[in-house]
């Protein structure tokens, strides 16, 4: 299965009539493996800050999480495993696997819990596959 299939069929899937607004799978170096059409272009320093927070949990909290120039307030995640951000009624979930970052961005009417479920399910599957 191609990385684009993971994004199209598994991250952008329909959940109770809702779906993520955008999603992507990136390498730890920020290289895009696959993305939805509306996924923002990430800056190298944004990817570096995300990777730093996975290695040093809490480092993003003072500055916020930035994706494509959009700032999200960092909320409760799972140190070293999942970063979650909030902006208004929407937000983002980032799951780190051995080789990839799985990123899902959502807005209303999708809920944070639905986004977490979609992103973390794919991330957990990839970890099980050694990815």
UniProtKB/Swiss-Prot annotation:
Primary subcellular site in the record, as a coarse category: cytoplasm
GO cellular component, one term: cell cortex
Record-linked Pfam families: Profilin (PF00235)
SUPFAM superfamilies cross-referenced by the UniProt entry: Profilin (actin-binding protein)
Localization per record: Cytoplasm, Cytoskeleton
Assigned keywords, A-Z: Actin-binding, Allergen, Cytoplasm, Cytoskeleton
GO molecular-function term, one example from the UniProt record: actin monomer binding
Source organism superkingdom: Eukaryota
Stored Gene3D superfamilies: Dynein light chain 2a, cytoplasmic
Record-stated family: Belongs to the profilin family.
Classification via PANTHER family: PROFILIN, PROFILIN-2
Subunit structure: Occurs in many kinds of cells as a complex with monomeric actin in a 1:1 ratio.
Role, per record: Binds to actin and affects the structure of the cytoskeleton. At high concentrations, profilin prevents the polymerization of actin, whereas it enhances it at low concentrations. By binding to PIP2, it inhibits the formation of IP3 and DG.
Name of the protein this chain belongs to: Profilin
